[in-house]
Amino acid sequence: MKKDVLIERIEELVRPIVSELSCELYYVEYVKENGEFYLRIYIDKEGRVSLNDCEAVSRRVSEILDVEDPIKEAYYLEVSSPGLNRGLYKEEHFKKYIGSEVLIRLTSSLNGVKSVKGLLRDVSEDSILVEGETEIQIPRDKIKAANLEGEI
């Protein structure tokens, strides 16, 4: 199964569980690190995500993944909050944090810089607007990584 199809399938399986437990599915990633596979599920909610939230989601998700078995190789399941310096992966993440301080790392130099730090001012389907020392319109396909900076 292709990785993006696998992630979609896992999101379909776990989203209802995460919602039942009063949390929001923030992001899912499946990676290989040092020869081991990791399924990482990031959850969020109003207020703070607690260790108990992560444990409850982990238990329930583990049960459904054991039954549905979408991943054929051995893997480690990790459930956590996305953290204060959370990654911004989807358009909805960018839109949620308009007005927040962000750090954007670029795939290649844009206007002589490889990273931009500033306030996220606007989001469109194909670009974001960040106000740092100057305003810069960044095409979405030039974003290597995007993270919140500081408190949310």
UniProtKB/Swiss-Prot annotation:
A Pfam cross-reference name: RimP_N
Keyword Secreted: no
GO cellular component terms listed in the entry, alphabetical order: cytosol
Biological process (GO), any one: ribosomal small subunit assembly
CDD domains on file: YlxS_C
Cellular localisation: Cytoplasm
Main location: cytoplasm
Key words of the record: Cytoplasm, Ribosome biogenesis
Keyword Cytoplasm: yes
UniProt similarity note: Belongs to the RimP family.
Provenance organism: Clostridium beijerinckii (strain ATCC 51743 / NCIMB 8052)
Protein's UniProt name: Ribosome maturation factor RimP
Signal peptide region: none
Function of the protein: Required for maturation of 30S ribosomal subunits.
